[in-house]
């Protein structure tokens, strides 16, 4: 250090004094200093869809610009979306989200089953019993539902027997989901994975995050459409696919307005 100081102050600079500690204004200059955040941007979801990514477009943006702190892309807890203020507290929001995911998964299966049964009937598979639309009436009748037209297959004479079987089966599955068992340990009870995910859809974390959002969104849609199926069946006495076929055949006459004055069910 001493040698460099002597070299700097030697006669090579022709008597010009060299400042070894220049002032701060000379270091930084007079330009404005701006600090820029260089954090990595979140990766878009694997499908590139604007609706299921982490920064999903909020459709209710017009109603309330400021999203609540609890609102993720999946559960929009804006004032308009949660009219009943069900997601006001964070703990309640988490519980409601768990219920929504479980009920949504059930509704997605139910809506598929309701449509599938009607599709099978339309494709001339001889289903002896009525479709799901009229099944509630048939279940209370003495003859009961003979699935797949074979009396010996699932010929449930008693609605209580059906109920007991459902309780046992669903109780076993839910018990595995919550407590673990021979199917594997529980990591996350809401999204159990393991044997509950035979296709391995949740192994990639990005795709898994996107699928969670899609599951909730499609589940809400399925719950609402299942409600619609029931209302249609009560009013028109037909299943959803029959109503759709009628509507496509004659969209002007066969639509909701034709039944808007019909308050006698199944007429």
Curated annotation (Swiss-Prot):
Chlorophyll b 3 binds at residues 158, 174. Chlorophyll a 4 binds at residue 218. GO terms for biological process: photosynthesis, light harvesting in photosystem I; response to light stimulus. Residues 1-34 form a transit peptide. Chlorophyll a 6 binds at residues 247, 256. Chlorophyll a 1 binds at residue 220. Chlorophyll a 5 binds at residues 214, 232. Keywords: Chlorophyll, Chloroplast, Chromophore, Magnesium, Membrane, Metal-binding, Phosphoprotein, Photosynthesis, Photosystem I, Photosystem II, Plastid, Thylakoid, Transit peptide, Transmembrane, Transmembrane helix. SUPFAM superfamilies: Chlorophyll a-b binding protein (SSF103511). Residues 19-52 are annotated as: Disordered. GO terms for molecular function: chlorophyll binding; metal ion binding. Chlorophyll b 4 binds at residues 166, 177. Chlorophyll b 2 binds at residues 154, 183. Chlorophyll a 3 binds at residue 215. It is found in: Plastid, Chloroplast thylakoid membrane. InterPro entries: Chloro_AB-bd_pln (IPR001344), Chloroa_b-bind (IPR022796). Chlorophyll b 5 binds at residues 166, 263. Binds at least 14 chlorophylls (8 Chl-a and 6 Chl-b) and carotenoids such as lutein and neoxanthin. PANTHER family: CHLOROPHYLL A/B BINDING PROTEIN (PTHR21649). The N-terminus of the protein extends into the stroma where it is involved with adhesion of granal membranes and post-translational modifications; both are believed to mediate the distribution of excitation energy between photosystems I and II. The LHC complex consists of chlorophyll a-b binding proteins. This is Chlorophyll a-b binding protein 3B, chloroplastic. It comes from Solanum lycopersicum (Tomato).
